[in-house]
Amino acid sequence: MNYIQAIILAIIEGITEFLPVSSTGHMIIASSFFGIAHEDFTKLFTIVIQLGAILSVVVLYFKRFFQTLDFYFKLLVAFIPAVVLGLLFSKKIDALLESPVTVAVSLLVGGIILLKVDDWFNNSSETEITYLKAFKIGLFQCIAMIPGVSRSGASIVGGMSQKLARTSAAEFSFFLAVPTMLGATLKKCYDYYKDGFILTHDQINILIIGNIVAFLVALLAIKTFIGFLSKNGFKVFGYYRIVAGIVLLLIHFFIHPLTLI
């Protein structure tokens, strides 16, 4: 991976991390299109640059992160399912990351679900998140272990299924991203070093640049998304996912197979 490729992936991460379109899925597809080698460092990079994106949440919602202990306990309750299932199925998840077709199908199916959810829970207005709601949202988030599903999309749908207002569901999804992505990054780094890999000077620089770019882009993306969501809902994202999924499948089966090198 070179610096230009790293910046491209970081921009994609910053834009898509908090949108219900799957950042991991988009980075897998981008890697296939741009011929980015799907080596161990690339896998590490796509996880670690999420730190830059989640830092934007801490900056934008700084005061919200220093409220009551109740806030942290609810995040912990929502985070537990991801910890348990992530440890149990991490190897199978890594295998799915090798398949752009999995991403395409997930985009398509997820888009249909997003359209339905936006219709079903269009008038939801609750803002209070109980411990039970937090746990259920955490369960929904685990569905996003399948590439292309979207972590933010799954957790937002989980929130709306609990009658939360769109913006409340989206903001809790942002907050939940912090422990989830931090945990995923720490585990990925541990596995990387456990397997005997050592970062080179260039790789460290690439990670730093990637995180900075992802942070700056995510700042703008979150502000834009919340404003758009409160007025327009999820339909545009649902249609985008459906179109993207169909186009990718057509390309794969009729033009050129989408593969990771």
Swiss-Prot record:
Enzyme category, top tier: hydrolase
GO cellular component terms listed in the entry, alphabetical order: plasma membrane
Any one GO molecular-function label of the UniProt entry: undecaprenyl-diphosphatase activity
Lineage top rank: taxon: Bacteria
Primary location recorded for the protein, binned into one broad class: membrane
Membrane topology classification: Multi-pass membrane protein
Reactions listed under catalytic activity: di-trans,octa-cis-undecaprenyl diphosphate + H2O = di-trans,octa-cis-undecaprenyl phosphate + phosphate + H(+)
EC numbers: 3.6.1.27
Keywords: Antibiotic resistance, Cell inner membrane, Cell membrane, Cell shape, Cell wall biogenesis/degradation, Hydrolase, Membrane, Peptidoglycan synthesis, Transmembrane, Transmembrane helix
Pfam family, one: BacA
Subcellular location: Cell inner membrane
InterPro entries: UppP
GO biological process: cell wall organization; peptidoglycan biosynthetic process; regulation of cell shape; response to antibiotic
TM helices/strands, residue ranges: 1-21, 41-61, 69-89, 95-115, 129-149, 169-186, 206-226, 241-261
Family, as annotated: Belongs to the UppP family.
Other remarks on this protein: Bacitracin is thought to be involved in the inhibition of peptidoglycan synthesis by sequestering undecaprenyl diphosphate, thereby reducing the pool of lipid carrier available.
Known role: Catalyzes the dephosphorylation of undecaprenyl diphosphate (UPP). Confers resistance to bacitracin.
Identification of the protein by name: Undecaprenyl-diphosphatase
Species assigned in the record: Flavobacterium psychrophilum (strain ATCC 49511 / DSM 21280 / CIP 103535 / JIP02/86)
